[in-house]
């Protein structure tokens, strides 16, 4: 896996301010003003692939409430992004049937990504929904068709685990729910250890709370090996395509007997990294 050419872990984000695209520098704190660099006609993904400094233009400081955030590096056309991930990658989920390469699934194109505060859509006939707090790797495919790692963020891979448990061949259907993603792109090696907690509210009251641990240290698999196998398939190597790869999760509310329902609010607090995702689940029909 090719890693960014940066020594310290920097944080970048994209947003719209006064109708124009900007790059943000650093992890925002509360309602503090944001430091932004106008993107102009530049493309952030191209800048990162070229090793250019996206912050080489003059920065402006603006009120946090006047910007609209975007998923990191999300192309303007949803078809320019693929959202997928691996299943049962963590040591706590290893059993006698664990394969040498974890199952990979496709959640959808770029339009399934949801930022904090947006609804997470799930099928109205879902059997048993659960949250999955995960590290998300971001890769950009270069002109030669090579997916190159540019950083990581955090997400919630909402899953109909009940459907998968009912029929093991239905993993692909179980994953066809929206995925929450943080707008921040961490420019460094994937984190070894991430800790935090989940809070699920129902009708404004606490419904369930639990802790989670994730990161590469929690994986049963070698990250380089599973990513190399995934990107050995030419079908995934379209130049310019952005890949969001969810790395799998610790045990969730489902394993504690809780079932997420329509209108539940799910909050994932990645405490170790200062990132919070909070979304309301909506079960909708076609």
Task: Give the label of every model feature segment.
Residues 2-21, 27-31, 36-202:
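Active-site microenvironments in enzyme catalytic cores
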Residues 2-6, 155, 161-286:
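Catalytic-pocket segment enriched in acidic/His residues
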Residues 24-28, 33-48, 208-216, 275-285:
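Short amphipathic beta-strand/extended segments with alternating polar/hydrophobic composition
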């Amino acid at each position: 896996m090719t890693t960014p050419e940066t020594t310290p872990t920097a944080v970048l984000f994209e947003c719209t301010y006064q109708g124009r695209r900007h790059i943000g520098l650093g992890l925002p704190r509360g309602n503090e003003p944001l430091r932004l660099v106008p993107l102009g006609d530049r493309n952030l993904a191209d800048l990162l692939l070229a090793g250019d400094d996206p912050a080489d233009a003059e920065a402006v400081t603006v009120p946090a409430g006047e910007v609209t955030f975007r998923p990191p590096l999300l192309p303007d056309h949803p078809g320019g992004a693929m959202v997928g991930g691996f299943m049962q990658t963590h040591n706590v989920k290893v059993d006698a049937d664990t394969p040498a390469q974890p199952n990979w699934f496709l959640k959808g194109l770029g339009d399934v990504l949801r930022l904090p505060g947006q609804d997470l859509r799930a099928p109205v006939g879902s059997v048993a929904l659960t949250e999955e707090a995960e590290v998300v790797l971001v890769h950009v495919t270069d002109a030669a068709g090579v997916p190159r790692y540019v950083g990581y963020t955090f997400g919630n891979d909402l899953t109909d685990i009940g459907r998968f448990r009912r029929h093991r061949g239905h993993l692909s259907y179980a994953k066809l729910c929206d995925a929450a993603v943080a707008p921040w792109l961490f420019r460094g090696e994937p984190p070894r250890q991430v800790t935090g907690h989940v809070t699920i509210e129902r009708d404004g009251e606490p419904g369930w709370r639990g802790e989670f641990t994730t990161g590469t240290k929690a994986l049963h698999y070698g990250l380089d090996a599973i990513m190399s196998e995934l990107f050995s398939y030419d079908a995934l190597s379209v130049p310019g395509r952005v890949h969001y790869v969810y790395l799998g999760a610790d045990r969730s509310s489902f394993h504690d007997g809780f079932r997420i329902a329509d209108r539940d609010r799910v909050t994932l607090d990645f405490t170790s990294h200062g990132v919070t995702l909070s979304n309301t689940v909506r079960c909708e029909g076609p």
